[in-house]
């Protein structure tokens, strides 16, 4: 079964690639599109294996995890945990003044945590590993060719690690209240009195827990 499956995949791949001309030589071994968690790990592994790697990103290095996901959400949860512990201190025989939240300072610490981790996902670090980092909009021309704002680069393999973006659901009236998303929420400087979170995924659950 494994041999048959491999043959079937090879035939399907040949049919898929039949409309494109494969270059005789390549500019690089591997192109990674997207510098989020998946893209950075892929580029790192490729560079570790001594492959020539080109990493393409159009926005911020680190992607969702560093800038609007894992890192800021954990920093916010840490602040929320401290607040919860102080509220329960009396149960442990510890008297503390009623804690107050300075939300602007909380968000300032969140940004500082991001800045602390940024160097690990930076262009400088990956350039030091031998990765060629490019900023721009990548567009697939063929299975081996990528256009980056007019510059064409060929590679033996291409990895798509472009991630995703928040989707605003079609709920009547939602567009009239200027809803936040998991990307724009981090711009808040005042703690909202009420917050409705639509979506029970990892980030949604973390934000609900923290707020």
Predicted regions: what they are:
Residues 33-34, 56, 160, 198-199:
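Conserved N-terminal Rossmann-fold NAD(P)-binding element of oxidoreductases
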Residues 36, 137-139, 201:
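Conserved acidic residues
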Residues 31, 185, 196-198:
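Surface-exposed strand-loop junctions at beta-sheet edges and helix termini
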Residues 3-28, 45-51, 56-191:
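Glycine-rich flavin
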Residues 189-211:
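Rossmann-like NAD(P)H-binding beta-loop-alpha module
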Residues 28-55, 204-211:
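N-terminal Rossmann-like FAD-binding beta1-loop-alpha1 element of flavoenzymes
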């Amino acid at each position: 079964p494994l041999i048959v499956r491999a043959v079937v995949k090879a035939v399907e791949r040949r049919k898929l690639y039949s409309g494109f001309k494969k270059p005789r030589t390549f500019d690089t071994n591997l192109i990674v599109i997207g510098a989020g968690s998946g893209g950075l790990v892929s580029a790192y592994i490729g560079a570790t294996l001594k492959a020539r790697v080109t990493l393409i990103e159009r926005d911020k290095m680190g992607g969702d995890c560093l800038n609007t996901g894992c890192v800021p959400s954990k920093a916010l949860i840490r602040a929320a945990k401290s607040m919860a512990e102080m509220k329960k201190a009396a149960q442990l025989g510890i008297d503390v003044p009623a804690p107050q939240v300075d939300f602007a300072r909380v968000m300032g610490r969140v940004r500082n945590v991001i800045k602390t981790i940024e160097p690990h996902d930076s262009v400088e670090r990956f350039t030091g590993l031998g990765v060629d980092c490019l900023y721009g909009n990548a567009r697939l021309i063929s299975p081996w060719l990528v256009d980056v704002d007019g510059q064409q680069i060929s590679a033996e393999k291409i990895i798509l690690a472009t991630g995703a973006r928040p989707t605003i659901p079609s709920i009547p009236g939602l567009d009239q209240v200027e809803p936040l998303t998991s990307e724009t929420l981090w711009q808040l400087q005042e703690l909202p009195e009420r917050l409705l979170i639509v979506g029970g995924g990892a980030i949604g659950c973390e934000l609900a827990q923290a707020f």
